[in-house]
């Protein structure tokens, strides 16, 4: 979202949204996904936030295990480790996250109906199976990273 304002190959960003802007966008996305959940009665649509949710939740769990103050600043998110410790460029890290979330979402939208028609389970059942498999794979990848 902020890429159109912040990405300037040879200069500084024209606009910096920071946490406040990110939270505003998050509320809009949560409203849209919440509306979809209410319309369908299927909570598995939260998968559209899975990559970012896994990183956020597991980072909090990691910090709790380390007895860190959750109110203090940190650099423990995977994207921060990739950019700061591994020196991978921010554009590459952001692109990786976006493409990973896109792949999870596209798989959810297109693969579940195919599995429903081939294997006979309901679409909602495949949504739950897909959600748990994706959650497990992302969690293992996070822990191994």
Indicate residue ranges for each PLM-predicted region:
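Alpha-helical transmembrane segments
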Residues: 1-145
């Amino acid at each position: 979202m902020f890429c159109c304002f912040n990405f300037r190959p040879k200069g500084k960003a024209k606009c910096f949204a920071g946490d406040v802007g990110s939270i505003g966008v998050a509320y809009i996305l949560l409203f849209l996904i919440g509306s979809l959940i209410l319309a369908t009665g299927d909570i598995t649509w939260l998968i559209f936030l899975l990559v970012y949710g896994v990183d956020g939740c597991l980072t909090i769990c990691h910090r709790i295990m380390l007895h860190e103050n959750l109110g203090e600043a940190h650099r423990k998110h995977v994207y921060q480790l990739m950019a700061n410790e591994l020196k991978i460029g921010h554009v590459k890290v952001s692109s990786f996250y976006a493409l990973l979330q896109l792949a999870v979402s596209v798989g959810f939208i297109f693969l579940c109906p195919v599995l429903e028609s081939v294997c006979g389970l309901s679409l909602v059942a495949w949504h739950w199976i897909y959600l748990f498999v994706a959650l497990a794979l992302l969690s293992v990848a996070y822990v191994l990273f």
